[in-house]
Every structure is written in structure tokens, then in C-alpha cells.
């Protein structure tokens, strides 16, 4: 079973305090595991044979609030999320994540479509686990690319700026744009490909890649979107 909240904070609060001092906001990966997580035997060859175990839940975050006050956390709530996980996130006012690259499959109720965003969320064009926006767009099948194009207003620029502008104009309270998208880079600049072990987390940019007027373009878009 998970350790009691007291045990956790007594051993980790000092380290957590140091992290909080150096960061504006932290993302909690696999947030659903704080409500329930999938436990498998250590000797299991696959993850098939396991069971759901109740996580530390609200007690942990209540204790962290006692120690640190307001928690500047973003809940990574991607994948299959239960009502109980949503309730835990909302109880503490943690924004969830909206990934625009996930927005164009399914119907009008797709939670990643901009029309379905809410203020208590963070919108991304894509994350470290996604392709770059340009790489993603070029890799789409023709029918899927047409679906994306149909959603975008005709006056939007081409990719990746169309998706960047869409993210900035979302109702989400915060928008995060990967550097690769701002530099208009393709799949060669992808940060991470889940399930693989080679070439990940190695991409770096150099200042000579940054166009002279990029700062002005970003400023104009953010101001027009009411984020300046």
C-alpha cells in the first residue's frame, strides 16, 4: 500500500520545497495514479495480470497544501480518465491538459477540440511525447489532414503557426508551445518517441536557428489572443 501522507512529506518535503522555489509550475505525470494505480507482481512478464490499488488521493494533496500553501501543479490527465480522477483534480483546482494534436479524431465531443476547452486547463500544440506539429501534420493521411484543414479558419497561416495560433486563442488559462514548433521544425527535432530507447531527449536548439523577428511574431500573437 502507498505510504501514509505523513511519512511521505516528512521524508520528501525538504526536496519538494527546493523544487517549488525554482519552478513556476510543475506537471504531475500520470495523475490518475494518485487516485488509483495498476499494481502487478514484480515477477510478472507483462502488465496484464494485476489489479487496481487505491492511491494516496486527497490526503496527500491536503498535506502538501499544509506544507506549501497553493500547489502550482498541472495534472497530466491524458488517456482513459475516470470521473473519480476528474473529481480529485477539480477538488484541488489543478488544471488538466489539452493536446491539439489529439483534437481531430472522433466527434464534436472530443475534449481536445478548442471549443471544448475550459479555463482550468493548459493547452499544448503537442508535448514531449508527440511529434512536432509540422512533423505530425505531414505524417497525417490525406483524409485526416483535410479534416484538420477544414477546422482551421481560412485566414490562418500554414502549419505549425495555424495550430500555435489556435492554441493561443483557446479558452485554456495557459498555453504552452514547444520550441520546435516556434522554429517550424519537422520530425527530425522530435523530443521523445514513447516505447523506444534510441535518440530520445537529445534534441537541442542553437541561437542561430532563431529568426530575428520571432520575438515580435510571438508577441503579436499573444497580445491578439489576450495573453500579452
Ranges and model annotations:
Residues 17-228:
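Active-site and adjacent substrate-binding regions of carbohydrate-active enzymes
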Residues 1-16, 20:
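Single conserved hydrophobic/aromatic residue that forms the stacking wall/gate
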Amino acid at each position: 500500500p502507498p505510504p501514509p501522507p505523513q511519512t511521505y512529506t516528512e521524508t520528501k518535503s525538504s526536496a519538494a520545497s527546493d523544487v517549488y522555489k525554482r519552478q513556476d509550475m510543475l506537471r504531475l505525470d500520470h495523475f490518475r495514479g494518485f487516485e488509483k494505480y495498476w499494481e502487478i507482481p514484480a515477477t510478472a512478464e507483462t502488465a496484464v495480470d494485476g489489479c487496481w490499488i487505491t492511491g494516496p488521493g486527497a490526503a496527500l494533496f491536503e498535506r502538501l497544501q499544509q506544507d506549501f500553501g497553493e500547489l502550482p501543479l498541472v495534472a497530466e490527465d491524458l488517456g482513459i480518465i475516470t470521473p473519480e480522477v476528474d473529481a480529485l483534480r477539480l477538488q484541488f483546482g489543478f488544471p488538466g491538459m489539452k493536446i491539439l494534436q489529439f483534437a481531430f479524431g472522433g466527434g464534436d465531443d472530443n475534449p481536445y477540440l478548442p471549443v471544448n476547452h475550459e479555463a482550468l486547463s493548459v493547452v499544448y500544440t503537442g508535448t514531449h511525447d508527440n511529434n512536432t506539429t509540422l512533423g505530425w501534420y505531414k505524417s497525417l493521411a490525406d483524409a485526416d489532414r483535410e479534416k484538420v484543414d477544414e477546422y482551421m479558419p481560412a485566414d490562418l497561416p500554414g502549419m505549425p503557426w495555424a495550430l500555435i495560433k489556435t492554441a493561443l486563442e483557446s479558452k485554456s488559462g495557459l498555453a504552452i508551445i514547444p520550441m520546435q514548433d516556434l522554429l517550424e521544425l519537422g520530425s527530425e527535432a522530435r523530443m521523445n518517441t514513447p516505447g523506444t530507447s534510441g535518440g530520445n531527449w537529445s534534441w537541442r536548439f542553437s541561437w542561430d536557428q532563431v529568426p530575428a523577428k520571432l520575438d515580435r511574431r510571438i508577441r503579436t500573437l499573444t497580445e491578439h489572443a489576450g495573453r500579452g
